[in-house]
Amino acid sequence: MNENIKLRLLENKDDLIEGTFCYSLFEESIFCPDLMTEFVEIAEFFLSYNNDLEIKQLLEWIISCVEQCFSSHHDENDYYHIKNYSIDIESKWENIWKPKLNYLLDIKGN
């Protein structure tokens, strides 16, 4: 079971796998709050039982990529644009999802 959960999380590393948060953000330019929430919840569950370096590296990568997407969105010289951008989504990223992912980087699984 844990291996299936890990593989599901790692699917986000391949931004060509439809139905993942990263596919939505990178390929469709849509920040899907439901997929981000699901990703965070699955990562939290997995890391509560496993101190997995590969998943923690994935979280660091996701944080970096999302930060870059918001930065590119705000750069008028950049072609990347988040189609469904809203201040609410960016606020939730800054105040809910990103802090939670950073917290998960620090926890040790059982």
Protein language model annotation of sequence segments:
Residues 22-29, 52, 83-87:
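Alpha-helical rod/repeat scaffolding segments in eukaryotic adaptors/tethers
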Residues 1-40:
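Short terminal alpha-helical segments
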Residues 63-110:
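Amphipathic alpha-helical binding modules
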Residues 41-57:
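Short, solvent-exposed, charged loop/turn and helix-capping segments
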Residues 15-19, 52, 75, 110:
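Intrinsically disordered or highly flexible coil/loop and linker segments, enriched in small
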